[in-house]
From Swiss-Prot:
Protein name as it appears in the record: Ribonuclease Z
InterPro entries associated with the record: RibonucZ/Hydroxyglut_hydro, RNase_Z/BN, tRNase_Z_dom
Gene3D superfamilies linked to this entry: Ribonuclease Z/Hydroxyacylglutathione hydrolase-like
Alphabetically ordered keywords of this record: Endonuclease, Hydrolase, Metal-binding, Nuclease, tRNA processing, Zinc
Gene: rnz
Binding site residues for Zn(2+) 1: 60, 62, 146, 216
NCBIfam families: PRK00055.1-3 (NF000801), RNase_Z (TIGR02651)
Record bears the keyword Zinc: yes
Catalytic center residues: 64 (proton acceptor)
Keyword tRNA processing: yes
Named cofactor requirement(s): Zn(2+)
Length: 315
């Protein structure tokens, strides 16, 4: 699994920070979180394959998070895409995509499936997989608070139990149809009448990785608790402002770096990657002061301020 930060800026891009977008590479697919203007060009400078993007997750409908969608949709059409593309987002996402496709002329002839998440439900599974290789995922949404309807996402790796071949052989089960049934989750009955369940011949799976993505939001304690419940490892949280601009953060319904650190503590995650940095900052020195203080009390926690093209590998 690998995260690639395609854009780490906020409402206004800079020479060094493009509009928000994060790509997650998992099991041969790319999952894109937000798609700000210039995303498709940022992709060119990375190993992210646009044709492997099957799912785009939009946190909210502000321009800096969505204006890269039309160009990306057209470009992958030019490259011959035929398989469906899923786009997820808050209410009115369907209308937004519909209006985007009305502008000008395009040659998009692959299916686009649009899924809207509720901002009333405390949490919901909006996407999942069930691959036979045992490496699956679930994507949850959780409503957050911004100036427009907004949702956060949690990507959860789901690993299936592995077959214990030696244990199966001890029970007299040979490689063949019976073993396949057990692998597929069904019980079998041996010739002696004994029933063998999948649990009898499997090794419990290792816990998969779990990544939280806040989108734009004020700090929400419930979001931190939601992440902790699911065992979040890596938290990607907006930190538009440094701590000296708390009033600006409140007025614009954004977070400061201190807010992000507070949610990190509540989430139990071991890594924070702060992003969505305001264009007013030429460097991150004012952020680092608060990070240093936090690290003095929590030396085991990893804290990064994302830059465009940052790659983070989850091993």
């Amino acid at each position: 699994m690998k995260l690639t930060f395609l854009g780490t800026g906020a409402a206004v891009p800079t020479k060094y920070r493009s509009h928000p977008s994060v790509a997650l590479k998992f099991d041969g697919e790319i999952f894109l979180f937000d798609c700000g203007e210039n995303t498709q060009r940022q992709i060119i400078f990375t190993d992210v394959s646009p044709m492997k993007i099957n799912n785009i997750f939009i946190s909210h409908l502000h321009g800096d998070h969505i204006l890269g969608i039309p160009g990306l949709l057209q470009s992958i059409a030019f490259q011959g895409r035929k398989k469906p593309l899923n786009i997820y987002g808050p209410p009115e996402t369907k209308e937004m995509i519909k209006n985007m496709l009305k502008i000008g002329y395009h040659s998009i002839d692959y299916p686009i499936n649009i899924h809207e998440a509720s901002i009333e439900s405390p949490e919901m599974i909006i996407a999942s997989s069930n691959n036979s290789n045992g490496n699956n995922y679930e994507v949850y949404t959780f409503p957050v608070k911004h100036s427009v309807p907004s949702i956060s996402y949690l990507f959860k790796q789901i690993k299936k139990p592995q077959m214990d071949i030696k244990k199966a052989e001890t029970l007299g089960i040979e490689i063949g149809p019976d073993l396949k049934k057990l692998k597929d989750g069904f019980s079998i009955q041996l010739k002696n009448g004994k029933v063998i369940t999948p649990k009898d011949v499997t090794i419990p799976p290792k816990k998969g990785y779990c990544i939280g993505y806040s989108g734009d939001t004020i700090p929400i304690d419930e979001f931190g608790k939601f992440l902790k419940y699911h065992g979040c490892n890596v938290l990607i949280h907006e930190a538009t402002f440094d701590s000296s601009m708390q009033k600006n953060a409140v007025d614009t319904m954004h977070s400061t770096i201190l807010d992000a650190l507070d949610i990190l503590e509540k989430s139990g995650a071991r890594t924070l990657i702060a992003t969505h940095i305001s264009a007013r900052y030429d460097d991150i020195m004012s952020f680092e002061r608060d990070i240093v203080k936090f690290k003095e009390k929590n030396p085991e926690i990893e804290i990064l301020i994302a830059e465009d093209f940052l790659e983070y590998v989850l091993k």
